[in-house]
């Protein structure tokens, strides 16, 4: 990249000596120059000048290349108008020259020497110039075979053009080198030649690189593991110290104080007694549950449903219940309020389980006219029926009035 100073100098030079147009084709605003002659050329003509070789024309870009001070001095010493006027003053100059002939001529060699001498700050004269003895390079001639397939020889012009092309190709090869060395001198370095052992070297370098990466990763892993172990150890020790402190404060110190005060045995005995009472309660409850399950009875008598009224009731346990209501028929037509009585059966005959006595119902006193109060009588209904007119009636007169406890059909108020 051209520096600001370089661009300033080139801008001043462009405004002089017809440098605002291409020296070869006359195109406006040229961006390339031939430093050897100090002339300005366009992009297309710069490619043609590169083909001549650096010994005939050294091409530089106005904006993209770096410039040296000697190159800027050559641009000041040369110029489009100066080079054209110098060529026209030479005896061997011909306007019909080709590009190669023009820059290979003695006149172009003299102007090159003049520009280089003036750029160095020296005086130049035509007589003392070493370019006076300049001989243009001879093109390489083709070696023709003695026997040609065709009888007609090639023309001199065709052979001359072929020789020029061969010479140009050789010159380009010497300047640019091989394909990979084309841009040498433009900031590119020449790559080293490949050898047969490059494959082995590349493999070994890859192996070394992989091993170095592995060692680096292993060292990082080891350092991370060390840090983790250190951190875990510190946390574990901290937790252990906290646990020991808590155990000392909550267990050991209270136990020591109780031992000193003599309360440790009281606490132990109270705890054992509480445990024994809980075990006893749980055991008794479990035994009641087991016995209740196998006996099929309820745990509490209050949980059993009340027995209802029926025509027959022979249960001995019901004789102790004195709060059972009398039925409707037992109090029907009675002027006296109902009284408590011992349980009796509504069946034909019922043995009193509590007293061992038997109470008679309506069949026992059928036809007797009055109820019998002999509770120890073992006669049934048919026996009373037979003695109704005889002994039964006489016995009935001797007995006291029937008790008001006889209800139902035995009541005389019915």
From Swiss-Prot:
The keyword Acetylation applies. Residues 310-327, 334-347, 362-388 have a biased composition (Low complexity). Residues 297-307 have a biased composition (Basic and acidic residues). The modification Phosphoserine is found at residues 150, 246, 342, 345, 347, 360, 362, 379. The region downstream of Arf-GAP domain is essential to GAP activity in vivo. This region may be required for its targeting to Golgi membranes. Interacts with ARF1. Interacts with the COPI coat proteins, KDELR1 and TMED2. It is probably a component of the COPI coat protein complex. The interaction with TMED2 inhibits the GAP activity. This is ADP-ribosylation factor GTPase-activating protein 1. It comes from Mus musculus.
């Amino acid at each position: 990249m051209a520096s600001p100073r370089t661009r300033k100098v080139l801008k001043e030079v462009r405004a002089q000596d017809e440098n605002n147009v291409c020296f070869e084709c006359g195109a406006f605003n040229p961006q390339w120059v031939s430093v050897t002659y100090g002339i300005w050329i366009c992009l297309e003509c710069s490619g043609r000048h590169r083909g001549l070789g650096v010994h005939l024309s050294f091409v530089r870009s106005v904006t993209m290349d770096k410039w040296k001070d000697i190159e800027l001095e050559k641009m000041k010493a040369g110029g489009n108008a100066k080079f054209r006027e110098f060529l026209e003053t030479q005896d061997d100059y011909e306007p019909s020259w080709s590009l190669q002939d023009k820059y290979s001529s003695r006149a172009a060699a003299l102007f090159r020497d003049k520009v280089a001498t003036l750029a160095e700050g020296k005086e130049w004269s035509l007589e003392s110039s070493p370019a006076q003895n300049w001989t243009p390079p001879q093109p390489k001639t083709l070696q023709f075979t003695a026997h040609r397939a065709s009888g007609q020889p090639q023309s001199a012009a065709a052979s001359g053009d072929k020789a020029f092309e061969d010479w140009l190709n050789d010159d380009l090869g010497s300047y640019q080198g091989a394909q990979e060395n084309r841009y040498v001198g433009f900031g590119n370095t020449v790559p080293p030649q490949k050898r047969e052992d490059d494959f082995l070297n590349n493999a070994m370098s890859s192996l070394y690189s992989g091993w170095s990466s592995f060692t680096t990763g292993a060292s990082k892993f080891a350092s991370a593991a060390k840090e983790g172990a250190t951190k875990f150890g510190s946390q574990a020790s901290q937790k252990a110290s906290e646990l020991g402190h808590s155990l000392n404060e909550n267990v050991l110190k209270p136990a020591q104080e109780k031992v000193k005060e003599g309360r440790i045995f009281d606490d132990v005995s109270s705890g054992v007694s509480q445990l024994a009472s809980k075990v006893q309660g749980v055991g008794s409850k479990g035994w009641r549950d087991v016995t209740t399950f196998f006996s099929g009875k309820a745990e509490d008598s209050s949980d059993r449903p009340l027995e209802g009224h029926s025509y027959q009731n022979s249960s001995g346990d019901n004789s102790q219940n004195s709060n059972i209501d009398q039925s409707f028929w037992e109090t029907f037509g009675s002027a006296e309020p109902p009284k408590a009585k011992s349980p009796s059966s509504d069946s034909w005959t019922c043995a009193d389980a509590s007293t061992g006595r038997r109470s008679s119902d309506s069949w026992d006193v059928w036809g007797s006219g009055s109820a019998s109060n002999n509770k120890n009588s073992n006669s049934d209904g048919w026996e009373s029926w037979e003695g109704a007119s005889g002994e039964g009636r006489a016995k009935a007169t001797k007995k006291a009035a029937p008790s008001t406890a006889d209800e139902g059909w035995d009541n005389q108020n019915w």
